[in-house]
Amino acid sequence: MKKSLLGLTFASLMFSAGSAVAADYKIDKEGQHAFVNFRIQHLGYSWLYGTFKDFDGTFTFDEKNPAADKVNVTINTTSVDTNHAERDKHLRSADFLNTTKYPQATFTSTSVKKDGDELDITGDLTLNGVTKPVTLEAKLIGQGDDPWGGKRAGFEAEGKIKLKDFNIKTDLGPASQEVDLIISVEGVQQK
């Protein structure tokens, strides 16, 4: 009887520990709960904001073990939108994103580290045919049950990339060499 009770207790502990491990989430872009935005200075006088309207992604989140976290995102670069059709056409050209040749950008995390209240998500960003490491500083906004019987987790992340690192050589002046990435995602836990 002792062995059976011990085995049952051990199995219960393993099941409980298993439910606290990493969970897989699909980014909820269909419900408009996810955004991949950017901004760049315009000639050093103002900020120009834009977004990518078409992207898909998943992430794995384990609050107790960030090293187990993973992020994978694919962006349709032709979906760039700065609220100005002529500028968007120029951004899709070979001067910038070269979407005819490189219609997708991808981000695949390689490590996640906890830094106080933030997560440093380092990964490989492939943009314009070039792959470079990029680190995003992310913060958990919230997590828990949703009204439809599911679970959700939301994050906001920021990072910077240099245009020249991704073979974008158009010179918009010294104040316009870096792009700020501003990303907000809500994920629906997969069962």
Curated annotation (Swiss-Prot):
It holds the Pfam family YceI. It comes from the Bacteria. It is found in: Periplasm. The keyword Lyase does not apply. Disulfide bonds: none annotated. The keyword Hydrolase does not apply. Residues 1-22 form the signal peptide. Keywords: Periplasm, Signal. Its main location: periplasm. GO terms for cellular component: periplasmic space. Belongs to the UPF0312 family. Type 1 subfamily. HAMAP family: UPF0312. This is Protein YceI.
